[in-house]
C-alpha cells in the first residue's frame, strides 16, 4: 500500500507539472489594441491575439477618440481571471468584465490570466460591418 501511495503521489506531481503552462511569477506579457488611427476611424492595430492558459497578460486598449468604441467579448471575459483594470491611472479590482466602452480618447489596461482554452471572438458594437472584429485564441 505504501508503494502505491508513493507512486500515486509522484504521478500526481508529474501530471501537475505537465499540465501547467504558465508561471505567474514571470512579468505579464503586453498585448496592444489600438482603435482608430489618423487615417481611419475604423482601423484596429491587431485583430488576432494568441495566448496560453495560466500565463499573465496585460492588454492595453487605446482609442484615438474619433468614435465611441464598445468592445464586446463576453465569452472571453467569462474565461479569464481578472487581476485588475486600470483606467487613466486609477486601478480597479473587479471580478467580472461585461464590456469595455471608450467614449473618448483614452486608454484602459486589463491585467488578466486566461483560464480556459478556446477561440473567442470580439467585436466593436455597431462597427462590425466596418471590419472591427477580432479573435482571442487561448491555447
Predicted regions and their residues:
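Beta-strand cores of secreted/periplasmic/IMS beta-sandwich domains, seen most often
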Residues: 46-75, 108-115, 121
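N-terminal edge beta-strand
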Residues: 23-58
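Short aromatic-acidic-glycine turn motif
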Residues: 77-88
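N-terminal signal peptide c-region/cleavage motif recognized by signal peptidases
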Residues: 15-17
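Soluble periplasmic/extracytoplasmic beta-strand elements of cell-envelope proteins
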Residues: 32-34, 58-60, 123, 135-137
Amino acid at each position: 500500500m505504501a508503494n502505491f501511495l508513493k507512486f500515486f503521489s509522484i504521478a500526481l506531481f508529474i501530471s501537475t507539472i505537465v499540465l501547467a503552462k504558465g508561471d505567474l511569477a514571470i512579468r505579464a506579457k503586453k498585448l496592444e489594441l489600438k482603435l482608430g488611427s489618423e487615417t481611419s476611424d475604423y482601423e484596429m492595430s491587431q485583430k488576432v491575439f494568441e495566448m496560453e492558459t495560466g500565463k499573465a497578460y496585460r492588454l492595453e486598449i487605446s482609442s484615438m477618440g474619433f468614435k465611441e468604441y464598445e468592445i464586446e467579448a463576453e465569452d472571453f471575459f467569462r474565461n479569464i481571471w481578472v487581476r485588475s483594470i486600470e483606467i487613466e491611472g486609477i486601478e480597479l479590482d473587479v471580478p467580472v468584465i461585461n464590456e469595455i466602452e471608450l467614449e473618448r480618447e483614452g486608454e484602459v489596461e486589463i491585467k488578466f490570466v486566461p483560464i480556459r482554452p478556446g477561440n473567442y471572438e470580439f467585436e466593436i458594437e455597431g462597427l462590425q460591418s466596418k471590419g472591427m472584429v477580432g479573435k482571442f485564441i487561448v491555447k
